[in-house]
């Protein structure tokens, strides 16, 4: 069946001919029309090339989303995400749509990791599908850019077992890092932060995520500053 997104977008444009459409409804139509869904999962639909976006509005601010969509390689020179050369109105609409995504697209009581009994495997699925991997990398390798932080990078988590006890790690995940330490105290706030996962994940889910991180034991990993 052909996607209805172009028809939805055409209807919105016709109804708002005096001004380009904005808001989450228009943003969802743009998101589909320009091909974002071919690489990104939202709920159970979409591709798996890029990060799952079901919780992206919880993980990132609208300000950062706008900067990222405007020019992905200006933020991360090695990203594979293309610059779609969107108009300001289309970008604004997509940002409003993404900023509203806070887990509601998962069916009630059904998350991707439900039914996985092994805590480490379950934690790995949470790490991937909740979006931790988008900032901390596959296997907790780190290296993702952030502004005005030490080294200009988000910390690796692959050495978490050398840095945290499990209770410490659970507490860290639960409260997040809403205000990362600035490299330059007089400079701007870092735009990428760790949200308080206790707001959207249960204690059991956070425990499983911690079990996964503590299972990672890289050779020669340095001390984390996370």
Residue ranges with predicted function:
Residues 36, 132:
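Short cysteine-rich clusters marking metal-coordination/redox-active sites
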Residues 1-29, 88-89, 98, 215-226:
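N-terminal export/targeting leaders of redox proteins
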Residues 24-30, 37-70, 74, 82, ...:
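Gly/Gly-Pro-rich "capping" loops immediately C-terminal to redox-active cysteine motifs
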Residues 76, 167, 178-186:
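Substrate-binding/catalytic groove segments of enzymes
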Residues 64, 84-110, 195-226:
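C-terminal capping alpha-helices of c-type cytochrome domains
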Residues 40, 98-102, 136, 174-177, ...:
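Protein kinase-like catalytic domain
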Residues 29, 63, 67, 92, ...:
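Solvent-exposed, polar/charged alpha-helical surfaces in well-ordered, non-transmembrane soluble domains
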Residues 15-32, 102-128, 143, 222-226:
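Electrostatic cytochrome c docking/interface patches
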